[in-house]
């Protein structure tokens, strides 16, 4: 048994790393325009930074399993736009993609993650509530799983080599939460604005995506990146996420007040008077 393990270790290879290492970028920028091209998203700095961060997270997880990366790229809106197809083609090999992660309390959830690089959480995001969002946030924060596979005698730590994408046809999928929604990076899709549908010519779409990975690899090799948003982009994200939360006028007033509040503590009476504009004796 030990001899087999030694021989297997000596002959190990990583197909995803091999794929990424074999890419040569042609120098043409694609990350900035990809989501607009296939899904009609805005080709702005936010969309560029969101997709770039997701790609670099996926690359980092392949080369440095278990590295800290908590971000989920969430594609929102546009039923039939090709959101799930985008994640599938992004994984390059269909075997490296799965959308079979339906429940986080499934005892087989970790086995379903094995061998996959891009994992789409579609139903969980679409039906999320405050409680399930907390579970997803906790799940995204993990850097490893500990479990036993068949024929193993003891559980082992398995560092994550995957990233998670989300998709939702519902706009207000994020609960009102000032503290933890930073993990969710929503990008609105507008299929009627897309240059092409991603499945119109799958061969061309795959070639485009391959070169986008090559561009991301050029950034990765440069070392000039971080696996998180800049402070400026984080502020933009916080404001942008409001568009994907349930409409609640009073909650919005309170959130706006708290965002500009500079004190160390706040009480309910203060919110009642200053955020909502009431008098104490009303």
Write out the residue ranges for each language-model feature:
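P-loop NTPase catalytic core of nucleic-acid-dependent motor ATPases
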Residues: 8-114, 267-272, 276
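AAA+/SF3 P-loop NTPase mechanochemical coupling elements
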Residues: 109-114, 149-167
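A short helix-turn-beta junction within AAA+ P-loop NTPase domains corresponding to the substrate/partner-engaging
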Residues: 174-195
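Structural recognition of the conserved hydrophobic beta-strand(s) that form the central parallel beta-sheet
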Residues: 119-122, 148, 161-169, 186-187
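Conserved AAA+/SF3 P-loop NTPase catalytic/coupling segment centered on the Walker-B
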Residues: 117-140, 174-180
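Long, low-complexity, charged/polar intrinsically disordered regions in eukaryotic proteins
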Residues: 204-241
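Conserved catalytic/switch belt of AAA+ P-loop NTPases
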Residues: 133-156
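DNA transaction DNA-binding modules
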Residues: 227-282
